[in-house]
Amino acid sequence: VRSGIPLFIVMRALGVISDKKIMEYILLDIDKNEHYLDHLVPCVHDAGVVFTQELALQYIKMFTKGKTISYVMDILSDYFLPHMGELKFKEKALFLGHMVFGMLKVYLKEEKPTDRDNYKYKRIETPGILLRELFREYYMIMKRNILLKMDKRYYYKKGFHDMNFVNLIMSEYKDIFRERDVEEGFKKAFKGNWGAQSHTKREGVVQDLNILSFISALSHKRKLNLPMDSTAKVIAPRLLNSSQWGLIDPVDSPDGGNIGLHKHLAISAEISTDYSMYDLLHFLKFNFNIYALNESTSHDLKHMTKVFINGAWCGLIQEPRESLSRLKIYKLNGIIPIQTSISWNIKNNILEMYTDGGRLVRPIFVVNNEKPSYESKKFKERGDYTWIDL
């Protein structure tokens, strides 16, 4: 899309037609949040004479490369908020409204802007993730080159008139598959030239391990590098953040331009491994009374707690406190993976869960009735502990 599209036109393209319904999707409770309406009036005027979904799609198609409604539908389903699903237009409209409402709160100074340096929002790229992305880049290059060679031989090779495509591959396979793009790419990457494209080039990914001592080698293996130029005159990313307590060593950082950019993991910190959010969503649907967004009413949206998994609004739930305590018990007993992050944002009434990889996690003690687990009478009598007990 070559230009910005007015908010209400995007909402109508997603199937939310009336102005009142669009404002309900944004504010949820119009009576309670009536003071926000004045700030949405310019959006109503920006929509002009576009009052139907068809007109909205016709308007958007003028700013696209394809110039067709089917091309616009492809963008809305595959590229607009892709984490919400492909054809879930109502869910995408609700999520767009949720984002606009959050932006209005920040604009009116009712909430602070998102702290981009908070480790809640940071993800660590481990060697496995870096290798996967590198392989994907060179695999796509190799695939493109093979297809190009096949096309040249099929359409332009003199003397080839066979309609059977398999015969072409069998007779020319040595030449078609001669280039070893993936192998050569990995060789270049491990010599320091990491990345296949100019915009994916990285410096400092491959380093010689410091083995002066066991401790220095261990520290070097747990080193984190913020992808910023050491000459950048920015202060906030270099400062200590309260969210790094127990995750990042507050002392072990070099002097000079790299101060605060090169960090080291704390001794007990780990990096989470990912698992599918749909496994957790399937578990919630069978064990909790969770309501799907496409079946929810405006009354449900006003009064029920939102459930977010990996940043995607997945549904609504009625009893967040009880659900949170049950989820924590399931997590402690290993019924759901122990590295699942679960929190309840009481102010915004959102139950957040994360299953993605790269999150920094650390062990904590369980406290029941203001007593930590290692002070219980049973363990004192026995005199020994296991990790499961703690």
Name every feature range the model reports, one short phrase each.
Residues V1-S219, P227, N241, A266-A269, ...:
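N-terminal non-catalytic structural scaffold regions of very large proteins
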Residues D249, K263-H264:
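Short beta-strand elements
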Residues S253:
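Short, acidic, Ser/Thr-enriched surface-loop or helix-capping motifs
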